[in-house]
């Protein structure tokens, strides 16, 4: 049916219609760029303002949260745009972090370059991980990616993360483990928080640009079905693999930023369950709106930190988390971001009504 | 006997009993022992422990907290009370960095005492050095805890512990071929058995290492692999949670009859003999990092008294607790020698580095800190053997580890004028 | 080859573990379309309940029954009360819901019992089959042999249930198309109850045996569900005999891998590698057009 519509329908356009369509299109385009600017502006503003209100504990926590938001944005692209489940994002984060650490310690490259190396590494691995997706149904793909995360867990526990040594693995023997060198423009914790916010804004902008161009349209068609996509002339292999690559890039950048925040990464923190939690909390945050990735990062790091700060027993916090996850899944199908956006829209509508009905 | 005198006699008997029990526990002694509560400006002391995770290491901070409570009830630090803040790093290096930042940069602690964590040494040692704050840790585990300028563990550490266990096996069982099983955790798996190996090389004993994945579901294959190397002693070198299923697997394969089993310090815990069962009765020797929990020395008794009077009933009375008590006592006695108005981070760190003859019957030898680049002052310990549902002491007392890696520590000891 | 035989036998114990868990997972998937991440957690809490009761000198059989009852009740609670609320969502979200439940159960278990080294001893531990092999002596305890037997029995029982009983037919219909089945008059709640009850019972039995064969530690037992998924994948989430065979093969290969010089440190990755290999080789499960 959709194939017929695209290929067969002929539409007659006359001058009147064009005169109405063009300003409408311009209006929509303006609106789109406005929301784009709003997104970038909000993230940069958050990054600027947060260090003023946070003590050292919260600066570190929120830096981790923003780094994980970068990775969560990648998960949101795959699930929100294409409906594909990736349960190995945290493993890709680890792979990116590994590459960034190795390059930073071994070649002493500038931090930005290390982050890009991390991103590109995870992009490549992500594209490989996405190859099974060409033949798999939803839950099966989820299981495949979970198996990959399990494999990564074992490998990284054997290899460990680079900490200043030589050789392929870069592990130091017999002397002090080194911390990753921070970027020259942001050595302090507060400055680094702002730096990570800039990267988050850049990554979100990159994703948004994808969504608004041919890539986004191709993804929407692929989501409707292979036949629709092929009939429209979309190269499924290229665009689907590219989506996995983009998600991997987000994970790699997030991993490099996390490595820079803490200084070291530890293999024990990369269990397969972390990838599953990241997917779960990204869904809770919301996969269609950019704020969902931000909320996912906060849920992953800031909420547990809050509970720890209040001295809540770690296991009671786990119970609370599980219950909150269930509750969010049940009551908020479009995620917390969806609920917030809906609430904002309702508020705006009510204000507009009040303004219009006022004498 | 006059019936009317019975109640009075009972009362007298009760009073005598109370006095006797009081004498058995002893009154907890700490700090200035004035019996008066301290009420000055608080001194901030912090601790980072691994509580939520594969194991709960918070006993050392609990013991230190009890000691500091006792100090506060007994005149404080020359009138100033101690405010002791404990943070849980949840076995995650990221969280460890966050909570250490909170303690050092937000709460501005002057020293940390009673830390016990698997992950915080690696994550925080550099920050502690950069901020000039000393850590008198309860228990250190991975290598980074024993190779940091500002981190001073009270315990001897896994490498020393396994070395002493190997030395015991060679002496008692004339063992010439040993296998050391250790989890492949970074900075532990490639370090913990190396002391035994190096000692063995210099003494004609062959020691091989098997590194295991702590998340593995298959303990039997590991024990079979160890047995296939035909050792006469197996050195178990892992946390007690991993130890119990491996000993169970060894028992099911009947290995206790052919091979001697010894372990490093983590096995010295009240729950272990019951969990591993009667098969290992008198068949499993364990190294201790401190003197036994039931030793009769006055400081050991004081530790128990402090916990009874100022700790919670649920606080474990284990070796982590001993370590936390000793750490808190060391910090308290150092602070007491300082001018209470001049207690800040720099002066406290200075004073701590000068500690050179701290004695406690919990420790085998006098403890010191010094200005070296690393700290491993406790490098001796006794052995105990599993007996029924508990442990029995082994003759021989404290054994000093003969680990070639300790050469720089011995040099530091000479510099401080110790033997 | 001689050196590998002892490990083949010791691998059968772990293999039985994976096989049983795999069957438990596939059963629920085939009847409700949900991958149960809480399978391990439900088994773990059952095992801890059994341990506590045995510590208080309860008779063995009652302790085991209490363990299985705990798992069944918790599973029913989720299946009847929480799972229906997620019913309109897609299968992945429904499976993530069980993850939330797993965290609640795991957190409760760890908080209640704490981290003390424990061992769940079963009476079948003291008896064993002895093998004196060239590569070394090996003993296969009755518990592990029992695990193997139970895996096969469970597989046969579930296969019978699904193919020969009315309830089984209804379960298969529900897994196929829930809405259509409801329209046809199948009482959805009733069938769901049976499915979650069965899954809970399997979880309880698996939990007891797992706690004995592996380790009585809640977090480890909960996340052993991930390698168990590997066994389920070998069975394509459909075939129970293939799941059991897959689980046993995975266990045996993981044990034998200890003898491969370069691969030994990575041997815990064996379940994942085998699952990935199976998926890449499988030709089915084409994407819908």
Regions found by a protein language model. Name each.
Chain B
Residues 28-34, 56-62, 74-145, 154, ...:
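Beta-alpha junction/loop-to-helix N-cap segments that form part of ligand/metal-binding clefts
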Residues 309-321, 332-395:
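Segments of small-molecule ligand-sensing domains
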Residues 128-131, 192-291:
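Extracellular/periplasmic bilobed ligand-binding domains
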Residues 151-214, 233, 311, 322:
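An alpha-beta-alpha
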Residues 250-325, 397-399, 412-418:
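Extracellular/periplasmic periplasmic-binding protein-like sensory domains
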Residues 31-65, 87-94, 116-117, 181-191, ...:
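Extracytoplasmic "Venus flytrap"
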Residues 31, 96, 154-178, 190, ...:
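Hydrophobic alpha-helical segments within soluble ligand-binding/sensing domains
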Residues 103-116, 136-138, 178-182, 230-240, ...:
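Periplasmic-binding protein-like
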